C-alpha cells in the first residue's frame, strides 16, 4: 500500500514538472519562425558541468555530507544548460535547465537539488527600450544598494523573478523600474523587491569632449510579512542611493552614498523586535592613470548594511536572498598560500556577546602600478613592471550598549583592527623565452573579529612567491612556482609549489602541493596535492583534477564560499554553440 502511494506521489510530481516544461515551451515558441534554418540562426546554447567523486582519505577523513545527511553517494554533479533564442529581431527567449544529481557538490545550498528549470525569461529590446519578464539580473550603481548575479563556482544565483523595464531618453537619461522575488533554489523568496534607478549623462547634454560627468539616483524597497505581534518596525524597508561619476582626461573619481531605513536586527535567524536600527554605506573611489603609471584609491564605510529579501536569511553562508553587493575590497591574490587568510566584508550588526560587538566596517585600499622604462638600470632591455597594493579594514568606533542592545557610532572613527594586506609584485622579462614574477605579501588577520572565534589571536603572516615561465617553442611552455608562508605563531608554517606544462595552446598539465609544517591541528603534516590537466578547442573546454582540497574560502571578486576539506576526482566541461 505504501509503495503504491509512493508511486502515485512520484507520478504526480513528474506530471507537474512535465506540465511546467510543456507550458513554458508553448509560451516561448508559439510565435517563433517555422523554418529550421531560421531557428538555427537565432539559437545559442551553453552547457557547463562540474562534477566530483569524493574519496575516503585517512588524512582528510571519510566522505560525509552532513547537510544532506548522506555518506554513500560519493558522486555529485552540478549541470547547467542555457538556451537563448532570438526571434523577430527584437525578442529573446531564454531558459536555463539545472541538474544537481544525486545532490549538489559539497557545501552548496541544499535548495539546489534535483533537476528543474532554474531560470526562464522573455526579453524585448529596441534602440531605446529594454523589457524582461521572468528571471532577470540587474545592478544599480556599484551594487551597494542592489545587485543580482550568478556565480556557479560560488553557488550564487539571486536572480529576480518578475519584470523589469529600462528606457533611454535623449541619449542621456537611463531609467529602470523593476519588481520581483528572489530566486531561492528552484523556488522564490517570501519577501518582494521593487526598485527604480535613474542615470543622467551630463557630458552628453553639454557636449563635453574630455570630461565625463554622470549622476545617478536609486530606490530599492523590500517588503516582507512580519510574524510578530505588535512589531516595532515596518514590513517595508526602504533604501535610497545617490552617486556621482566624474572623469577628466587621465583622472577619474566616483562617490556613492546609500541609506537604509530602520529595520529589525537579525542574529542567528532570530528577528529582534527591540533592536531596531537604520543603516548606511559610503563608497569613494578615485585614481589617475597614464601609460606606464596608475594610482587608484578606494575608501568605504558600511554600517548595518546587511540587506536580504527574507529577514531570517540574513548572513547565510550561501548568499541566498541577498539584495546588495558588499565584497571584500582587498587585492585578489593568485597564489595558493596568499589565499589562506582571506578577508570578508563585515557589513552586519553582531551583538551576540559583550566581548564581540560589531556594527560594520571602515577602511580602504590603495593600488599603485608603475612600469620602469626599457634601457634603464632597473628596467633592462625589456622594462620592469611593478605593482603595489595596501589595504586596511577595521570595525566602526563608537559607544556600544550590550545590555540595552543599542549603539552610536563615530562617522569616521576606526575601531578594532580587522585586517591588513600589503603586497609588492615585480614582473620581469629576461629574454624572449624567459619571464619571472617575484611577489611578497604581509597580512594581518584578526580571526576573533572576522570569524567570531573567541579563543583566537590575530595572525600575522609574510608570504614570498617566485614564479618563472619558459617558452619552449611551437606553443610549448613550462611554468614553475615556489611559495613560502611564515607566521608569528607556531601553527602556520607553509610551503608550496606548482609545476605546469603547456603542450600547446589547447592542452596543459599541472601538479601542485602545499604543506603545513606548523602545529595547526586541522592542517598540520598534510600534503594538499593536486594534479590535472585541461583541453580547449574553440568554445569547448574539458578539465580533470585529482587531489586534496584544504578547508577554507573560495573567493571570486571579493565574495567567498566556504569549502570543506575533501579528497577526490573533479571534472569540468564547458561548451557553447
Identify the role of each PLM range.
Residues 117-118:
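Extended catalytic core of nucleotide-activated donor transferases of GT-like folds
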Residues 91-98, 131:
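Short N-terminal amphipathic alpha-helices
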Residues 1-46, 577:
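Bacterial Sec-dependent N-terminal signal peptides
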Residues 122-169:
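Well-ordered mid-protein domain cores that form the structural environment of catalytic cofactors
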Residues 81-83:
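Histidine-anchored nucleotide/phosphate-binding helix
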Residues 40-42, 53, 58-76, 86, ...:
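Signature for the C-terminal beta-barrel architecture of outer-membrane proteins
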Residues 99-102, 139:
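Aromatic-lined carbohydrate-binding surfaces of glycoside hydrolases
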Residues 538, 545-547:
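Long, intrinsically disordered, low-complexity segments
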Amino acid at each position: 500500500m505504501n509503495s503504491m502511494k509512493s508511486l502515485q506521489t512520484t507520478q504526480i510530481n513528474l506530471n507537474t514538472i512535465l506540465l511546467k516544461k510543456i507550458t513554458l515551451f508553448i509560451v516561448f515558441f508559439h510565435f517563433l519562425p517555422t523554418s529550421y534554418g531560421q531557428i538555427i540562426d537565432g539559437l545559442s546554447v551553453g552547457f557547463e558541468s562540474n562534477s566530483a567523486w569524493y574519496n575516503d582519505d585517512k588524512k582528510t577523513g571519510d566522505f560525509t555530507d552532513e547537510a544532506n545527511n548522506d555518506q554513500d553517494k560519493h558522486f555529485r554533479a552540478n549541470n547547467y544548460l542555457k538556451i537563448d533564442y532570438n526571434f523577430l529581431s527584437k525578442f529573446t527567449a531564454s531558459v536555463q535547465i539545472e541538474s544537481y544529481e544525486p545532490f549538489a557538490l559539497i557545501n552548496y545550498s541544499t535548495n539546489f537539488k534535483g533537476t528543474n528549470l532554474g531560470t526562464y525569461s522573455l526579453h524585448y529590446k529596441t534602440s531605446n527600450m529594454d523589457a524582461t519578464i521572468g528571471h532577470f539580473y540587474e545592478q544599480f550603481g556599484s551594487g551597494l544598494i542592489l545587485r543580482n548575479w550568478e556565480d556557479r563556482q560560488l553557488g550564487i544565483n539571486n536572480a529576480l523573478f518578475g519584470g523589469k523595464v529600462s528606457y533611454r531618453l535623449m541619449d542621456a537619461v537611463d531609467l529602470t523600474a523593476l519588481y520581483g522575488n528572489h530566486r531561492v533554489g528552484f523556488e522564490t523568496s517570501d519577501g518582494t523587491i521593487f526598485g527604480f534607478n535613474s542615470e543622467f549623462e551630463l557630458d552628453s547634454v553639454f557636449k563635453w569632449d574630455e570630461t565625463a560627468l554622470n549622476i545617478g539616483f536609486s530606490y530599492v524597497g523590500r517588503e516582507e510579512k512580519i510574524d510578530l505581534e505588535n512589531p516595532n518596525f515596518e514590513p517595508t524597508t526602504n533604501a535610497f542611493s545617490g552617486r556621482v561619476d566624474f572623469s577628466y582626461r587621465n583622472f577619474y573619481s566616483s562617490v556613492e552614498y546609500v541609506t537604509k531605513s530602520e529595520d529589525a536586527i537579525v542574529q542567528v535567524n532570530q528577528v529582534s523586535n527591540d533592536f531596531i536600527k537604520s543603516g548606511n554605506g559610503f563608497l569613494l573611489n578615485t585614481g589617475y592613470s597614464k601609460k606606464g603609471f596608475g594610482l587608484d584609491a578606494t575608501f568605504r564605510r558600511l554600517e548595518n548594511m546587511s540587506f536580504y529579501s527574507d529577514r531570517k536569511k540574513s548572513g547565510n553562508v550561501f548568499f541566498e536572498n541577498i539584495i546588495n553587493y558588499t565584497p571584500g575590497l582587498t587585492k585578489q591574490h593568485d597564489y595558493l598560500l596568499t589565499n589562506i587568510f582571506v578577508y570578508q566584508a563585515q557589513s552586519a550588526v553582531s551583538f551576540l556577546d559583550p566581548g564581540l560587538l560589531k556594527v560594520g566596517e571602515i577602511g580602504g585600499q590603495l593600488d599603485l602600478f608603475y612600469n620602469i622604462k626599457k634601457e634603464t638600470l632597473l628596467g633592462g632591455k625589456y622594462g620592469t613592471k611593478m605593482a603595489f597594493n595596501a589595504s586596511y579594514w577595521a570595525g566602526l568606533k563608537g559607544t556600544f550598549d550590550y545590555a540595552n542592545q543599542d549603539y552610536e557610532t563615530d562617522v569616521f572613527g576606526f575601531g578594532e583592527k580587522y585586517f591588513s594586506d600589503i603586497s609588492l609584485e615585480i614582473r620581469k622579462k629576461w629574454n624572449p623565452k624567459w619571464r619571472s614574477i617575484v611577489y611578497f605579501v604581509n597580512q594581518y588577520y584578526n580571526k576573533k573579529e572576522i570569524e567570531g572565534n573567541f579563543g583566537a589571536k590575530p595572525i600575522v603572516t609574510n608570504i614570498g612567491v617566485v614564479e618563472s615561465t619558459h617558452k619552449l617553442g611551437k606553443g610549448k611552455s613550462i611554468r614553475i612556482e615556489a611559495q613560502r608562508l611564515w607566521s608569528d605563531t607556531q601553527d602556520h608554517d607553509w610551503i608550496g609549489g606548482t609545476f605546469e606544462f603547456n603542450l600547446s595552446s589547447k592542452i596543459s598539465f599541472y601538479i601542485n602541493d602545499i604543506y603545513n609544517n606548523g602545529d595547526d591541528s586541522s592542517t598540520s603534516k598534510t600534503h594538499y596535492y593536486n594534479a590535472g590537466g585541461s583541453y580547449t578547442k574553440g568554445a569547448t573546454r574539458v578539465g580533470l583534477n585529482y587531489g586534496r582540497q584544504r578547508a577554507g574560502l573560495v573567493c571570486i571578486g571579493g565574495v567567498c564560499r566556504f569549502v570543506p576539506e575533501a579528497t577526490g576526482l573533479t571534472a569540468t566541461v564547458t561548451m557553447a554553440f
